[in-house]
């Protein structure tokens, strides 16, 4: 099997959390107990408790206990990465209050929020006994002790990981887990080259994968086995927030990006429609919201409830937050972008820049305007080249590269970049993740997700309102107001949104008899099963094709 993030597969298969999010259309924000068979939450959300299932156990047969839960969250708060520490910043006490009960409370100076209990419930629980004799701060290649439906059987670094189903998995009969995890073995193969991965699945070396490159999706999977129905090519639409896929983001620690006029000018230079038509086969939609494809996204002008949140900051916000809807800049998609370029040059002039001998120059210092870009992949670098070339045409000097992924992550997390890219896909109940991505608090933490170094009191206020909302209308008012403030500050140059996920696979698998379009997330990994009749059909069909 090959999925976009093999790490995520490992967490899902080997670990266990107290709650699991339901993936069905009609319950987009529901959580069900996995490790927990009971939960209590106070009316003000300042206190909550979980009761752990008494039959839960680790893969070595020892019980999974409340002591493990307490250890996990104390460790996360003290030594977790910046994102985890930000998410749990309001958490105060974590205590064992019974053989099966664990109690949580928030700090006195923090307000209880509806999202915190469920966010806590989705963290993977760690073994206190295992980490008592192993250093959790050290990198290791030894798979840690798990409690999930699978365990690591074998692996070769950089090549594959083989997971084996745990036959006596304690959670098999938990209601939300029934019917899941039907394969005895799951193998995740690693590839360094996308084209080799494409040829591997067409050659039947791997069974299923996500296709992440639009050109390959549109051109590479039309071959005899697909024409005979032995190989499937499916766009699986997800009725959930799509967010923003790989927008250009700016490091606001760089002085030149601190001027909102410069950021808007850079946004105007980007011709998304042209890039989507020419490079991406017109496959994507424009990500016009941080919460694109959801009720959390802004629409029209601010509502009365949004204005209640925004008006106290009228003097601190761009006027257009109140008077205009944020929309994609007008373009014909054929590179005729003169009006937008003219406006971009006006904004650069207002910010103190002019083109001197073909070079965009700071009029006060005489320094050229330059941008050093790093992209997560060679595909993203290729996708970004029309934007970079457009910048070059107005005198902005650029460099661009796609380093090895670990180096890209290090540079983004440590702020060693000027322009970069990021993948942002919110869930249906964002809150702690918003704080990690956009809050002043996270900007001050090393290695947080706030790579842009956004420090905006209005953004902080609106994130708190999202997290504190008790009613749906208040929640949507807060997300929409936040959406407008982020967009009109031009922190990102939006690009595309992904309408679900593109799955290619050999037709050997049974699937639940449900409408797959009505899901909130991917279900193939844990709900499919091996279908002998289908597998035999594929084998016979391939033999026939080879003989023809």
Give the location of each predicted region.
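Gly/Pro-rich hinge or "lid" segments in bacterial periplasmic/extracellular proteins
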Residues: 25-27, 119-185, 192-196, 203, ...
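Ligand-site clamp/hinge motif
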Residues: 53, 138, 169-222, 264, ...
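Aromatic- and charge-enriched surface segment that lines or borders ligand/interaction sites
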Residues: 37-82, 97, 103-105, 191, ...
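N-terminal lobe/hinge region of extracytoplasmic solute-binding protein
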Residues: 16-17, 21-43, 74, 145
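Surface-exposed binding/hinge segments that line
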Residues: 51, 85-132, 149-156, 302-314
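Detector for C-terminal structural segments
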Residues: 156-161, 165, 268-328, 342-345, ...
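Single conserved hydrophobic/aromatic residue that forms the stacking wall/gate
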Residues: 1-15, 20
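Extracellular/periplasmic solute-recognition and catalytic clefts
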Residues: 76, 93-96, 153-164, 189-254, ...
């Amino acid at each position: 099997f090959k999925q976009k993030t093999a790490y995520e597969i490992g967490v899902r298969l080997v670990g266990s959390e107290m709650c699991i999010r339901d993936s069905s259309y009609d319950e987009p924000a529901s959580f069900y107990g996995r490790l927990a068979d009971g939960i209590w939450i106070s009316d003000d959300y300042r206190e909550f408790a979980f009761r752990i299932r008494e039959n839960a156990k680790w893969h070595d047969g020892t019980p999974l206990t409340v002591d493990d839960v307490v250890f996990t969250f104390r460790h996360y708060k003290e030594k977790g990465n910046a994102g985890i520490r930000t998410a749990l910043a309001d958490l105060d006490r974590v205590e064992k209050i019974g053989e099966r009960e664990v109690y949580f409370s928030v700090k006195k100076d923090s307000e209880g929020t509806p999202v915190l209990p469920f966010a806590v419930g989705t963290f993977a629980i760690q073994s206190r006994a295992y980490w008592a004799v192993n250093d959790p701060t050290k990198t290791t290649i030894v798979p840690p002790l798990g409690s999930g439906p699978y365990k690591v059987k074998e692996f070769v670094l950089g090549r594959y990981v083989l997971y084996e189903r745990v036959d006596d998995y304690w959670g098999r009969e938990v209601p939300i887990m029934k019917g899941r995890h039907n394969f005895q073995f799951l193998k995740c193969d690693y590839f360094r080259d996308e084209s080799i991965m494409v040829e591997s699945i067409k050659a039947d070396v791997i069974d299923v994968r996500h296709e992440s490159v639009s050109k390959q999706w549109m051109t590479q999977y039309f071959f005899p086995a697909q024409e005979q129905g032995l190989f499937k090519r499916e766009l699986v639409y997800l009725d959930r927030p799509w967010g923003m896929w790989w927008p250009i983001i700016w490091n606001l620690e760089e002085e030149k990006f601190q001027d909102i006029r410069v950021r808007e000018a850079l946004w105007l230079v980007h011709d998304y429609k042209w890039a989507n038509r020419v490079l991406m086969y017109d496959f994507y939609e424009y990500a016009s919201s941080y919460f694109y494809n959801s009720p959390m996204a802004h629409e029209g002008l601010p509502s009365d409830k949004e204005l209640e949140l925004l008006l106290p900051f009228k003097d601190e916000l761009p006027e257009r937050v109140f008077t205009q809807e944020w929309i994609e800049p007008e373009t014909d998609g054929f590179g005729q972008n003169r009006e937008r370029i003219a406006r971009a040059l006006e904004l650069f002039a207002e910010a103190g820049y002019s083109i001197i001998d073909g070079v965009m120059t700071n009029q006060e210092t005489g320094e050229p305007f330059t941008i050093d870009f790093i992209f997560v992949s060679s595909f993203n670098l290729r996708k970004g080249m029309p934007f970079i070339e457009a910048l070059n045409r107005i005198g902005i000097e650029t460099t661009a590269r796609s380093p090895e992924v670990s180096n890209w992550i290090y540079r983004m997390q440590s702020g060693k970049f000027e322009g970069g890219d990021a993948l942002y896909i919110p869930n249906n109940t964002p809150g702690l993740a918003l704080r990690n991505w956009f809050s002043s608090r996270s900007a001050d933490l090393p290695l947080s997700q706030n790579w842009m170094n956004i420090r905006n009191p209005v953004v902080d206020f609106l994130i708190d309102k999202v997290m504190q909302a008790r009613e749906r209308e208040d929640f949507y008012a807060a997300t929409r107001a936040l959406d407008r403030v982020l967009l009109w500050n031009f922190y990102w140059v939006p690009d595309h949104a992904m309408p679900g996920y593109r799955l290619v696979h050999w037709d050997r698998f049974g699937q639940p008899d449900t409408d797959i379009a009505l899901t909130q997330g991917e279900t193939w990994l844990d709900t499919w099963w091996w279908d002998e009749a289908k597998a035999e059909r594929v084998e016979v069909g391939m033999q026939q094709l080879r003989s023809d």
